[in-house]
């Protein structure tokens, strides 16, 4: 069986990002979101996440790899803030710009998640697919995040077992500062496109969230 988790990063980055992520869950194929806990829109995101009972909600950590001595304290504060906002433990853990992959950061994170039994992106039995992204080499590549681009990824990258595809949908509002901006609205349209949902059905891929991992992995 092929199982697919579709996770939105940057939940809480702005009200427009929050709105797009919730839409991608309610109208599209999104099954999980990763929450930034220290942003102005974090409280709104957490409230929206609590309303979306079928959407797995994890934490999107912001850590300073250049000051590794501070990482344990940053980690503890952000995990505590997540619990405060969501009133539950995270279903999964990842990080802004994948900083958790840095060898100066990773041991601290794995020590906590090992005790808590929470999967870390790229360090669990869930295969991570990061190719649904519309920018590289300083150039925008909308073809990678359009419908045809996503269908190619489904065919080439989703295998037997559990795969996580991360994405960055959202609405870009005035004042939103990010090098990855207009691409987010393209991602949102793609995730909500009926052709994508039908393609997943045709390929016998089952959409799940992180809460479904034990059943999917036969644990």
Regions inferred by a protein language model and the residue ranges of each:
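Acidic-and-aromatic substrate-binding clefts and catalytic sites of carbohydrate-active enzymes
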Residues: 11-15, 35-44, 64-71, 96-105, ...
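Structural preference for beta-strand elements that scaffold enzyme active sites
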Residues: 3-5, 30-34, 54-60, 90-92, ...
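C-terminal domain-boundary segment and adjacent tail
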Residues: 178-219
